[in-house]
């Protein structure tokens, strides 16, 4: 079966955790797009009512408006009931690599603002150890780029400036740049996260550690739901 189908199935199952009256975080990326379309359908047919969403990117905001999903802000809803988003890699402890969609800063803020963070993914995103397949995105301010490149390389990464389809540097919604860092398998994600955060000029990184409450993963054998007993929020 098609990987797109698995992502759509995971998104549909994750929507079962949304209840009427909730304020929720709306993720960014292909799986999140399936979730947005499913959410719009449930709002349109009355299965859900009075749901408002905080988008994690301008891209998500545009699609949500097109679909008629009511939007809000963290100023109005600083505490969210739920956040739904995809992931680029998921390990057995529900530690994640995110950010290939370029929205990891807002995604992390929204996930941290939610009582529960539910990750939706196809089985292709499951790994034994983070870094097996994906680079680690690191968002940096333009002024700090040279320093960040040196420091990230010293940590064992191979930083590559992300560019858009035209070949120009990719610019995030916050006006920053992204270095896709190829570390290979990450032996100690917590230590690496701390080291990256200590680099002046780094705004955010794509390691989401201890944040996911539940992962909804779809594959050829159906859907599995993995809970993380040591997540910071249940």
From Swiss-Prot:
<feature type="binding site">
    <location>
        <position position="125"/>
    </location>
    <ligand>
        <name>substrate</name>
    </ligand>
</feature>
<feature type="binding site">
    <location>
        <begin position="98"/>
        <end position="101"/>
    </location>
    <ligand>
        <name>substrate</name>
    </ligand>
</feature>
<keyword id="KW-0413">Isomerase</keyword>
<feature type="binding site">
    <location>
        <begin position="85"/>
        <end position="88"/>
    </location>
    <ligand>
        <name>substrate</name>
    </ligand>
</feature>
<dbReference type="InterPro" id="IPR004788">
    <property type="entry name" value="Ribose5P_isomerase_type_A"/>
</dbReference>
<dbReference type="InterPro" id="IPR037171">
    <property type="entry name" value="NagB/RpiA_transferase-like"/>
</dbReference>
<dbReference type="InterPro" id="IPR020672">
    <property type="entry name" value="Ribose5P_isomerase_typA_subgr"/>
</dbReference>
<feature type="binding site">
    <location>
        <begin position="28"/>
        <end position="31"/>
    </location>
    <ligand>
        <name>substrate</name>
    </ligand>
</feature>
<comment type="subunit">
    <text>Homodimer.</text>
</comment>
<comment type="similarity">
    <text>Belongs to the ribose 5-phosphate isomerase family.</text>
</comment>
<dbReference type="InterPro" id="IPR050262">
    <property type="entry name" value="Ribose-5P_isomerase"/>
</dbReference>
<dbReference type="GO" id="GO:0004751">
    <property type="term" value="F:ribose-5-phosphate isomerase activity"/>
</dbReference>
<dbReference type="Pfam" id="PF06026">
    <property type="entry name" value="Rib_5-P_isom_A"/>
</dbReference>
<comment type="pathway">
    <text>Carbohydrate degradation; pentose phosphate pathway; D-ribose 5-phosphate from D-ribulose 5-phosphate (non-oxidative stage): step 1/1.</text>
</comment>
<comment type="function">
    <text>Catalyzes the reversible conversion of ribose-5-phosphate to ribulose 5-phosphate.</text>
</comment>
<feature type="active site" description="Proton acceptor">
    <location>
        <position position="107"/>
    </location>
</feature>
<dbReference type="GO" id="GO:0009052">
    <property type="term" value="P:pentose-phosphate shunt, non-oxidative branch"/>
</dbReference>
<protein>
    <recommendedName>
        <fullName>Ribose-5-phosphate isomerase A</fullName>
        <ecNumber>5.3.1.6</ecNumber>
    </recommendedName>
</protein>
């Amino acid at each position: 079966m098609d990987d797109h189908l698995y992502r759509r199935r995971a998104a549909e199952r994750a929507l079962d955790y949304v209840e009427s009256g909730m304020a929720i975080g709306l993720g960014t990326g292909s799986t999140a797009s399936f979730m947005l379309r499913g959410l719009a359908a449930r709002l349109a047919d009355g299965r859900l009512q009075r749901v408002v969403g905080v988008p994690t990117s301008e891209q998500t905001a545009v699609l949500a408006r097109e679909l008629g999903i009511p939007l809000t802000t963290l100023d109005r809803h600083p505490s969210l009931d739920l956040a739904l988003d995809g992931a680029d890699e998921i390990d057995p402890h529900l530690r994640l690599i995110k950010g290939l969609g370029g929205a990891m800063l807002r995604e992390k803020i929204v996930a941290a603002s939610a009582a529960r963070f539910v990750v939706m993914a196809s089985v292709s995103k499951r790994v034994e150890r983070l870094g097996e397949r994906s680079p680690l995105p690191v968002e940096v301010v333009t002024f700090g780029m040279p320093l960040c490149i040196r420091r990230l390389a010293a940590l064992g990464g191979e930083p590559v400036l992300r560019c858009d389809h035209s070949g120009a540097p990719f610019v995030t919604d916050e006006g920053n740049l992204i270095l896709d860092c190829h570390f290979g398998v990450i032996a100690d994600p917590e230590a690496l996260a701390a080291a990256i955060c200590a680099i002046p000029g780094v705004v955010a990184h794509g390691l989401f550690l201890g944040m996911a409450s539940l992962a909804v993963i779809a594959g050829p054998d159906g859907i599995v739901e993995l809970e993380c007993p040591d997540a910071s929020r249940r």
